[in-house]
């Protein structure tokens, strides 16, 4: 395909509003353009990459018996009222009315639609299982769209739904999807982890997230590609290396989520769901009597601990939340942080939010900084992290401004429900006892859920079982963020290309090393001088030969400076560059492997044979 015929509007500079490298490079390399806040046009290069990813998905889903279809994006609100999500989904839901004043939404997900279709068509367990999916644009009214395709108001998603007559059958399909997702993301060239996830607004029972890891850009060997003009990193002057390090560090590490994973096992979880190894301890010290002490001007745990000369681990942090309009007291060891997802899940609450200071005063009789679990009103619900029960003679707020109590002992001085509600810390033992927890940032690219009967119960989707009884259909849900795959791939495969000019100056610029399976084209064929007829003829022959061998070829036939062509080639990021230059009359061309920066001159007649050898090596 001729580059002059494509819309590839590359830019000479990075866009000023981009904070993450994937957003900057997608815009600069001419892959996307923003039409409105959080709404993007996918230009030819991006569209080709997305279509290649769709092909990978379709091939893997066919292996597990998943069937593609297409549902409408414009949905009646009545379906969402049936499930209860019309009221609970929140402000992100696009709501609109037609000319008859009927309520509609733009679908962010399609559980209700697929449930209704199957409910109306399937009557017997003999018609199950069903495994359906679609690839479609979704809509979410994000309050603050950001980071390019990672947080948008319109996005492309693959959402699949499976329908079963029992949970055992669901388990089989769930495992099929887990393996299919691993195959898809592996083929896409992603470094990813399957982690324990939160069902969130989907209402799932069990769930697993697939996170593309976005590591810090500190390893020069990984992130920097040297041109053939530079033998090794050691040849680069120290001051230039420092500039390169600064450029790598200048771009924010993307990823909405923090992942906690074990250094020695397969355990991995979203930080919201991560736990650690917990061992109850036996109390050995005698229990002191409660004593009220004045703690003037002490509002925080560290201030109280310093004032009383105790360790923060000997204090109790007391928080008040409102869960579905009911007050709930949450307790933590002083140096721990609350994990509101764990608390919300434990309470099975639809809404959970921190109480205001006015609400805290009404409940405790004191303001923030002096709250505690002792002598609360009878019937008060207290949920404490499991570590709290190991404390002896702890310090807690006295529910009196400017005062705390010492000698607080769980069980004697207050009763609580003990459960894991804390945020894990890096370096703690993995819950399986193997290795310690490390953190990484990640981009969620896929999520699978065991929905169970969440939607079939609320929407009356039943079948007749083996005994002729009406039972709810058991469901699974399986999503992949198709458009954000482009961001994830670029985040992982962006590179800083460094070269040395004939004058001895060092220059560096960002580009992409697209993995072969997702690159919009396989080969970038560049004619240095389009006015040279010999070069033109050789280019045409090579394009035809490569295409005949199954390569997708992008031919740069533009009448541009060679430096501009090479810069655009680095930006676009195709795996192989073939240059027809000054030696065209001799039948000599240059091959450059983008991933390594390695280049070689070959006879044009041996080009395809050489490419087959080189691509096997890389």
Swiss-Prot record:
Q: Which GO terms describe its cellular component?
A: cytosol
Set out the biological process GO terms recorded for this chain's protein.
prolyl-tRNA aminoacylation
Q: Which UniProt keywords apply?
A: Aminoacyl-tRNA synthetase, ATP-binding, Cytoplasm, Ligase, Nucleotide-binding, Protein biosynthesis
Q: What is this protein called?
A: Proline--tRNA ligase
**Keyword Aminoacyl-tRNA synthetase included in the entry's annotation:** yes
- What species is this protein from? Streptococcus pyogenes serotype M12 (strain MGAS2096)
The Enzyme Commission number assigned here is 6.1.1.15
Asked if the record carries the keyword ATP-binding, the reply is yes
